[in-house]
Amino acid sequence: MSEDLKRSASDIQDELAQSPKRVKFNDPPQIDDVNKYDANNVNANANVNANANVNANANDSNSNNFASIASNVTTNPIDFTVTQPQPVSPEIQNPITTLLQTDPGVGASKDLLTTNGSAINITKNADTNNIETNTASINPVSNTNTNTKPASVDTVDIKSVSANTADTATDTKPVSADNADTATDTKPVSADTADTADTDADAKPASANTSNTTNANTAGTGASNTDVANSSSATTSTGDAKPQVQGANETGSNQHDQRDSSKLNDAIAAAGVDIQKEEELLQQRQLNRKPGAPSEKQDGSKSQTQVPLLNPYHLSAFLAKVSKTHQIHQNFLEDGNLLNLISDACEDWLSHIASKALILSRHRRRGTQFSLKKGGLSSLTQLSQQRSAVSKELRNLALRQKEMEEKRVQKRIVLGLEKSSGNGTDDAANGKPGSEETLHRAANATAAMMATGKKKYSWMSSGGGGAGSIGSLGDDARGSGVGIGGGGVGGGDSKTKQSAILSARGDNGLRYRDLRSTNAIVLKDLLNALEGEKKGTQHAITKGYAKLRD
């Protein structure tokens, strides 16, 4: 308490007589003045629980009510014990002393404030840590108890809570004037700090008639909290708290928006529009706008990049080489579309040539059609015996040549020009390469060649019979007219003659190779396919036929 606010007891009585609405004890009165009040006529029961239910029962027999007395508790949780008033020393001159002592246990109700025998019972719930107090009307009387003590200065100016806010407050804490600047979740605020203290946005708005810390209805006799609640229906916000009117406006705007959206949905449903399908279509169109995204025709399948047939680097080098001969200088690597076009054209042309070569290969390998007969060979055997027409024609030619050769050799044997294969073994022994006669003849031939230096043919040294027969044949032909066969054929040594061709050729004289058809395209088929093309194929055809082997 500051010393500059001390007043005398007479000033306090005058203020009580003039303005019963507000009593402010800046300095406690003297003990003699306090004895004028009868504390036995004051029954103040303030039962405040954690659920913010305010029950105030005040029996007022006098016509004047003075200010509410409340106790603010800022610490959480704190239990208080009631102590008896202690004698006051004359130096302090403060007869009103409230001793607060912290109770470590959480339990039943405690008497927090005592005014010389008249106690204000404050009930503290064991489950909660918040304490709320309600105002109680104290009726000043005369000449009874001398131990009545008014409340301390720090707890005098407390707003009374209206019924509207008291029933809805849940986690509230009364805040004293000293701690008004630091309190956050506060509901009632003292009048001394109403102009300066900044409350939090969560603070509940106080009633409009409580700006002076007392209800306007306390002037009349028998006023209760119910009358205060009825008269203080209009509310205003304290500090930075938002007014309730703004919240009501926001709620109304939200309801209006909900009604508009519901009407819009009803209109869309009545028109037969499927919102889900429209959203899917819009999303698909957005995906199609992105580069590389699949189109609608592909049904979401990923587009595959085609690899060109010809390598762009080698193709551009070849084009640059050809264009350089025509005095055209161009970098074909920069024009990728041109390279792709040429590559696609080459691929189409090569596919055309390959198709023609395949058709020619099938015609070349096509065999003679066989008709199946009853009791004949199985179809598998007949298919294995199928040959091409060219192969069959070659076989027929070989057989005819063999027959002609056999007839010719047979005629030579009849004429005695060749030795028959059915003669005795002596002739075979004489003509044996390892016999003495053969070696002797070979030695004579070698000596003759060394001496004369000329080769002596066999018809010159085959015997005098052969040569003499020819000469005698001429003489005899002139004189006697002997036939040719006597000296020439009969007189000659026909046993020494042997057909070397038949011995080398074997039985038939020609080796036959059966050409089976194969599922492949050969060089001849490609050359035949290129012959149908007119431009740019002559040089390739010439090289192809040069490499073709029979």
From Swiss-Prot:
GO terms for biological process: DNA-templated transcription initiation. GO terms for cellular component: transcription factor TFIID complex. Residues 206-226 have a biased composition (Low complexity). Residues 316-396 form the Histone-fold domain. Residues 165-187, 227-239, 246-255 have a biased composition (Polar residues). Pfam families: TAF4 (PF05236). Keywords: Coiled coil, Nucleus, Transcription, Transcription regulation. InterPro entries: TAF4_C (IPR007900). It is found in: Nucleus. Residues 1-29, 165-262, 287-307 are annotated as: Disordered. Residues 380-412 form a coiled coil. The keyword Ubl conjugation does not apply. Functions as a component of the DNA-binding general transcription factor complex TFIID. Binding of TFIID to a promoter (with or without TATA element) is the initial step in pre-initiation complex (PIC) formation. TFIID plays a key role in the regulation of gene expression by RNA polymerase II through different activities such as transcription activator interaction, core promoter recognition and selectivity, TFIIA and TFIIB interaction, chromatin modification (histone acetylation by TAF1), facilitation of DNA opening and initiation of transcription. The 1.2 MDa TFIID complex is composed of TATA binding protein (TBP) and the 14 TBP-associated factors. Belongs to the TAF4 family. This is Transcription initiation factor TFIID subunit 4. It comes from Lodderomyces elongisporus (strain ATCC 11503 / CBS 2605 / JCM 1781 / NBRC 1676 / NRRL YB-4239).
